[in-house]
Amino acid sequence: MTDVDLRARPQEGMKEIPAGPKGRHQTVQVTVGNVKVGGGAPIVVQSMTNTDTADIDSTVKQVAALARAGSEMVRITVDREEAAAAVPHIREKLDKLGVDVPLIGDFHYIGHKLLSEYPACAAALAKYRINPGNVGFKNKRDTQFTEIVEIALKNNKAVRIGANWGSLDQELLTRLMEDNAKSPNPIDARAVTREAMVQSALLSAQRAEEIGLPKNKMILSAKVSNVQDLIAVYRELAARSDYAIHLGLTEAGMGSKGIVASSAALGILLQEGIGDTIRVSLTPEPGGDRTLEVKVAQEILQTMGFRTFVPLVAACPGCGRTTSTVFQELARDIQAFINEEMPAWRNRYPGVEQLNVAVMGCIVNGPGESKHADIGISLPGTGETPAAPVFVDGQKFRTLRGATIAADFKALVIDYIEQRYGGAPAKPSTVTAAE
């Protein structure tokens, strides 16, 4: 075997191994209610209700839950007159609850009619979502699209032009397919569909600008349900324009499949600097928690280093050295405790969302990983001494023993948060120094 000298030559110095995303794709900033989207603003998390919008109380309850979970914009379906009539009442009730999250109206087929006949709805919404595939058909398309854009201009509202391959503009797709068939070098039909997605969004945006809607009032999206197609479409959309971009994998699915697919697609695009606002479109279990899509979106952004929302708890996966479940239970309990307390902590302890906690299960990686965290514990693995060293700011602080290790560590975490983020000395003072 050939020896390889991996040491840097003194005269050259050590070569830096770069980490981090590419620079953000530069887009025109759009204001949606009280939220800035694009133009270098933090990537915005949004979500969508699944209630009947005409059911005012149920919709208010779910919007409030999504907002409190961290959704910074919430989209609601406006599909009929009863829903349009309910929108201003939903806005009013949310305001009384102190929930100022911007509401986005999701319109299909008859959006022009609902917005014109219910001006209070048009005024209460912060943004209108238009689907260029079903805003109108044949000779009615331009008229109905123009009507929505003019209402947006009148009310000083933003618009998302959201193409979706499940409802793609069939006239555009047919024309592109026919042009491709006549080409001496035809491309794959799926590639034509991707091109149609990009053109649908961009041609609609161009038309909106011609009507008078400026770029700083437009956000574009082009959603598909296949990860590779989604990546390709958004890369092209970003390459051809500087409109603010809404990312999302449509019909991602249920459970782990939906989470993994969305994380893979959005993670790649975000790493390439593409995306100004994201939504994770999960299919919830019957009666499931709708706020899961918000938590997943936040975790994607936080694990990639784009934003911080809640303190992170790092925990090892466990192996044959960790037959005890103590570290798993402690990691779960600490994360649950943090999530429960975060609404109050955000105001009481500014910056606490940047806290890193480690709960490790044995001596192999436990001490090292705990040192990387702000506060960490290395619990004993199988056959190891029943003692758990705690590390604070990279230094061994003390060793916990006995049946109360979990409770003692939780108390240390609370003390650390209070003193680091509450203005007191950074090191816990209610416990003794390292033993």
Swiss-Prot record:
Residue intervals passing through the bilayer: none
| EC class of the enzyme, as a word | oxidoreductase
Look up the domain of life of the source.
Bacteria
Q: What's its catalytic activity?
A: (2E)-4-hydroxy-3-methylbut-2-enyl diphosphate + oxidized [flavodoxin] + H2O + 2 H(+) = 2-C-methyl-D-erythritol 2,4-cyclic diphosphate + reduced [flavodoxin]
Name any one GO molecular function: iron ion binding
Q: Per its UniProt record, what Pfam families does this chain match?
A: GcpE
User: What's a BP term from Gene Ontology annotated to this protein?
Assistant: terpenoid biosynthetic process
Pathway the protein contributes to: Isoprenoid biosynthesis; isopentenyl diphosphate biosynthesis via DXP pathway; isopentenyl diphosphate from 1-deoxy-D-xylulose 5-phosphate: step 5/6
Q: What is its EC number?
A: 1.17.7.3
Cofactor(s) the protein needs: [4Fe-4S] cluster
Task: Briefly state the protein's biological role.
Answer: Converts 2C-methyl-D-erythritol 2,4-cyclodiphosphate (ME-2,4cPP) into 1-hydroxy-2-methyl-2-(E)-butenyl 4-diphosphate.
Xref: HAMAP family: IspG
The entry assigns this protein to a family as follows: Belongs to the IspG family.
* UniProt name for this protein: 4-hydroxy-3-methylbut-2-en-1-yl diphosphate synthase (flavodoxin)
Q: What is the lineage of its organism?
A: Bacteria, Pseudomonadati, Pseudomonadota, Alphaproteobacteria, Hyphomicrobiales
